[in-house]
Regions:
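A short glycine-threonine-serine/GTX helix/turn-capping micro-motif
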Residues: 1-10
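Catalytic-loop motifs flanking and including active-site residues across diverse enzymes
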Residues: 10-17, 62
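Short glycine/serine- and small hydrophobic-enriched flexible loop segments
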Residues: 20-24
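Non-catalytic terminal extensions of PLP-dependent enzymes
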Residues: 26-172
Length: 172
């Protein structure tokens, strides 16, 4: 063979990148990367679970991701929702989505964290600090937020839509 070429679409590029990482790091190196992601996810899960407003959805973390929600008793008296927390965190540069669960659980609003490769313990501490600061700011509110009012009226509430351009997505 005198020439080798790869023809792949964009999704295949990510798979090829994954293969490269596996070959470069080897099994042990790749395992360490995943163990680090799990350790950071476990840490975040535990620390967020200790925060007064929140309840983790699951007891254990089995993948480097988890979700949490407002404790029902806290949510009854709060003047804000997780959508408001999402917006506050976005102001600090964090993309932590808030959304409703699928059918039959659509009344549950949750937030999700996915710990990716390279997300360090220092970054986790910074995120926790920003969550804590956002909660402090939200708890100082004198009046309920528009999302809280809509939620109380049982109106549909959706979080803001993220785009890399900063412009709303076109509906053309």
């Amino acid at each position: 063979i005198t020439q080798v070429g790869l023809n792949f679409s964009r999704p295949a590029a990510q798979i090829l990148g994954q293969y490269y990482q596996f070959i470069r790091l080897g099994f042990q190196g790749y395992k360490e990367v995943q163990q680090n992601s799990m350790a950071v996810a476990d840490y975040l899960h535990a620390e967020i679970g200790k925060m007064a407003p929140f309840q983790n959805y699951s007891k254990d973390v089995v993948n480097p991701l988890f979700i949490w929600y407002l404790k029902p008793d806290y949510a009854k008296s709060a003047k804000w929702t997780l959508y408001d927390l999402q917006d506050k965190l976005k102001q600090s540069g964090w993309m932590v989505p808030a959304y409703t669960l699928p059918e039959n659980l659509e009344n549950w609003v949750v937030m999700r964290i996915v710990v990716r490769q390279g997300f360090s313990r220092d970054m986790a501490d910074q995120l926790l600090g920003d969550i804590s600061n956002a909660i402090t700011d939200l708890e100082k509110l004198e009046y309920p937020t528009p999302t809280r009012i809509a939620q109380d009226r049982q109106q549909a509430v959706k979080g803001s839509v993220f785009t890399h351009t900063g412009c709303p997505k076109s509906t053309k």
